Amino acid sequence: MSSKFIKPGRLVILLNGKYAGRKAVVIKTFDDATASKSRPYGHCLVAGIDKYPRSIVRSMSRKTILKRTAIRSFVKVVNYNHIMPTRYNFEGRDESAFTGLKNTVTVESSQVAKRAHTRLAVKKIFEAKHKAGKSKWFFSKLRF
């Protein structure tokens, strides 16, 4: 698959592996020419949602609302063949959240030793965006 459609900020759906069916944001792309020996194929760095926030109603307690709106995130390097690009982007006109995400998630921070800290930072960015009511499609579970 060409990286013509897969650009940073594009929302994608993962097709294979542990996070199959989960939505993610492309942070950085690596084409065949720039690939290292360990990954001699087109791939990209993505940050996505492992556990989606659930719906809430006004009558729920504050504690229940906090528990139900919690998001679990993941950071992963994925082959282009294992993702499906969507028509959506992470940001519309406001680029601040994606810039924060791009600064937080780097190739070095996606390594196993630093991944836990990176996941927490991504979780905070996603929760802030969810609380603001942006990208409703991204924060809803994919039904299949």
Curated annotation (Swiss-Prot):
- Matching InterPro entries, A to Z? KOW, Ribosomal_eL27, Ribosomal_eL27_CS, Ribosomal_eL27_KOW, Ribosomal_eL27_sf, Translation_prot_SH3-like_sf
Which PROSITE patterns does this chain map to? RIBOSOMAL_L27E
| Single GO MF annotation | structural constituent of ribosome
Q: Which domain of life is it from?
A: Eukaryota
Q: Name one GO cellular component term.
A: cytosolic large ribosomal subunit
Q: Which first-to-last residue range defines the signal peptide?
A: none
Q: Which UniProt keywords apply?
A: Ribonucleoprotein, Ribosomal protein
Protein name stated in the entry: Large ribosomal subunit protein eL27
Which GO biological process entries does UniProt record here?
translation
Keyword Metal-binding applies: no
For this protein, the record's CDD domains field holds: KOW_RPL27 (cd06090)
KOW domain: residues covered: 6-43
Which family is it part of?
A: Belongs to the eukaryotic ribosomal protein eL27 family.
- Indicate yes or no for the key word Ribonucleoprotein: yes
